[in-house]
A protein has these predicted regions:
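Short, contiguous pre-domain boundary segments
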Residues: 7-21
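Hydrophobic alpha-helical segments, chiefly the membrane-spanning helices
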Residues: 349-352
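Active-site Gly/Thr loop motif
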Residues: 298-331
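Rossmann-like dinucleotide-binding core of oxidoreductases
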Residues: 123-132, 136-138, 142-238
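Rieske [2Fe-2S] iron-sulfur-binding domain
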Residues: 51-174
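Glycine-rich, aromatic-lined ligand/substrate-binding cores of catalytic
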Residues: 185-307
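Conserved small/polar residues in nucleotide/adenosyl-binding loops
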Residues: 337-345
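Non-catalytic accessory segments flanking enzyme active sites
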Residues: 18-69
């Protein structure tokens, strides 16, 4: 079994074989239990800081039966609110992104400042309990930022995000994820429960079938040069419930070199990108992994990859896959989360970037 040289197993290695009832994937009753006991108490990654850089910029995100507003404040901080007027429950906006000083209720015209305070209500003097502008605010949601992402928690007494993430906090800081730019984003409506999607990204058993190379020249290796054999993968589970898979990468079939074969794409392209000639490379197949690591160490800083100095050699080539409880996954450079349907346990949404 593969064991990373620089990444020890996370502390919780006691994986129990507990059967899972299929009703968890199609039961309305179980879906309601998730909304009662889980969703209101977990940290949810819902936004990206760079999407709302200036004061008054906001991002709206629907999640299951709830809708949230993430709003940049004058001091640069971000506040999050339920996207609902506190008067009669009307939705404040349907726009995914925007800029505003006030959120105006489309029903009775109440105006809420970007910091959540009510500043205008029609006929405010007619309310027997007094002017609502004196004491009403939008319902605020606990908010933190990390790695350039906006995280919210509906539980005001929830632990800090750093405590929730556990070992992921330090590992992600090394990548300087806060500097990442999003170039592609899409949302897919899925005819399945939200957990099925996460189950898929939480195991590598399907890779040899779904992602098998077109030319079956190797036992268990994807075209990208990622070794998908469980013997070459480190599986970890943290005490916080998050998972990590480390799959060795950056090399081709050893037999092809020994038999005078050639290094094929995409590995050949990766080598050329780092000034290694695949046609004149000598050595066994696994040696390309070390060669790419050394080339990235040498050339990376000159090309602007200054964060390479924060990374171990494995991180320069290998595939690090994270699944964060309950609904977020990072697979190479693809980030995705799943959102439950408001009413149907057999449906879900999958926004990704």
């Amino acid at each position: 079994k593969f064991q990373s040289k620089n990444f020890k197993n996370w502390s919780n290695s006691d994986l129990k074989n507990i059967p899972v009832d299929g009703k968890r994937y199609n039961s309305y009753e179980f879906m309601e239990k998730e909304w009662e006991y889980m969703w209101p108490k977990v940290w949810l990654l819902l936004g990206r800081e760079e999407e709302i850089p200036n004061a008054g910029d906001y991002q709206m995100e629907d999640f299951g039966k709830e809708s949230f507003l993430m709003v940049r404040q004058d001091d640069g901080s971000i506040k999050s609110f339920y996207n609902v007027c506190q008067h009669r429950g009307a939705r404040l906006t349907f726009n995914d992104l925007g800029t505003t000083e006030t959120f105006n209720c489309p029903y009775h015209g109440w105006k809420w400042r970007k910091d959540g305070k009510l500043i205008e209500a029609q006929d405010s003097e007619d309310f027997p309990q007094g002017d609502p502008c004196q004491n009403l605010r939008l319902e605020e949601v606990k908010t933190e930022t990390f790695a350039g992402f906006i995280w919210i928690n509906m539980d005001r007494d929830a632990c800090s995000l750093k405590e929730w993430l556990g070992p992921i906090w330090d590992e992600w800081q090394a990548y300087e994820i806060h500097k990442w730019k999003r170039y592609v984003a899409q949302t897919v409506n899925m005819p399945c429960n939200w957990k099925i999607i996460l189950d898929n990204f939480n195991e590598s058993y399907h890779l040899n079938t779904v992602h098998a190379p077109e030319k079956a020249v190797t036992k268990k290796r994807m075209p990208s040069g990622v070794d998908t054999s469980y013997k070459s993968t480190q599986f970890d589970l943290s005490d916080e419930g998050h998972n990590r898979m480390i799959m060795q990468a950056g090399y081709g079939p050893a037999a092809s070199f020994e038999e005078g074969g050639v290094i094929e794409d995409p590995l050949a392209t990766v080598m050329r990108d780092w000034e290694i000639d695949p046609n004149n490379f000598t050595g066994r197949g696994f040696d390309t992994r070390e060669a790419i690591q050394k080339a990235k160490r040498k050339l990376g800083p000159k090309r602007g990859y200054t964060h390479y100095e924060n990374l171990h050699d494995e991180q320069l080539t290998d595939a690090f896959h994270y699944t964060l409880f309950p609904n977020f996954a990072v697979s190479l450079c693809c980030l995705l989360y799943t959102s439950p349907s408001p009413r149907d346990a057999t449906l879900s949404r999958m926004p990704s970037s």
